Amino acid sequence: MTCGKPADYRYGEHTADVLIQAYGCTLEEAFVNAAVALAEVTYSTSKVEPKHSREVEVEYDDLEGLLFKWIDELLYLFDAEKFAISRKIDLKLEKDGGYRIKAVLYGDIYSQEKHGFTGLIVKAMTFHMMEIRQIGDYWMVQYVVDI
């Protein structure tokens, strides 16, 4: 989509951590790009075929807590199931008192030979430098992960 956003996502310098900024014309798109950016820290999502799917539902009172739970759930799927997400993610963000994400992630079981390895493994999500805001016509989601 075109809306003036600078990119889908980008990385910033941060020692022992990775600062991720994800962008979207909608808040949903920014959350999807935040997920793709997380995966790209470790492997190439463009090499992941959408062979399998996982349904994810997370909720929280505010957007920052929702982002934390969303990214944390993706880390769990990779750690526990070796589920590598592709760029295909169907995500719906609902506001009903609090916030809820209902998403279907498409991907495959991670294979270093098929999906590559950047040399970095994300250990944990943090609240450090977290920011979610609308900038003109697009949304920016920023967060830091420990590597």
UniProtKB/Swiss-Prot annotation:
Record's keyword terms, sorted: Calcium, Metal-binding, tRNA processing
Key word Magnesium present: no
Database matches in InterPro entries: Archease (IPR002804), Archease_arc (IPR022952), Archease_dom (IPR023572), Archease_dom_sf (IPR036820)
Residues reported to bind Ca(2+): D17, D146, I147
Transmembrane stretches, start-end: none
GO molecular function: calcium ion binding
Keyword tRNA processing: yes
Residue ranges that the Swiss-Prot or TrEMBL entry lists as coiled coil: none
A Pfam family annotated for this UniProt entry: Archease
One GO term of the biological process aspect: tRNA splicing, via endonucleolytic cleavage and ligation
Role description: Activates the tRNA-splicing ligase complex by facilitating the enzymatic turnover of catalytic subunit RtcB. Acts by promoting the guanylylation of RtcB, a key intermediate step in tRNA ligation. Can also alter the NTP specificity of RtcB such that ATP, dGTP or ITP is used efficiently.
Family membership: Belongs to the archease family.
NCBIfam families: PRK00407.1
Protein name (record): Protein archease
Organism, scientific name: Pyrobaculum neutrophilum (strain DSM 2338 / JCM 9278 / NBRC 100436 / V24Sta) (Thermoproteus neutrophilus)
Lineage of source species: Archaea, Thermoproteota, Thermoprotei, Thermoproteales, Thermoproteaceae
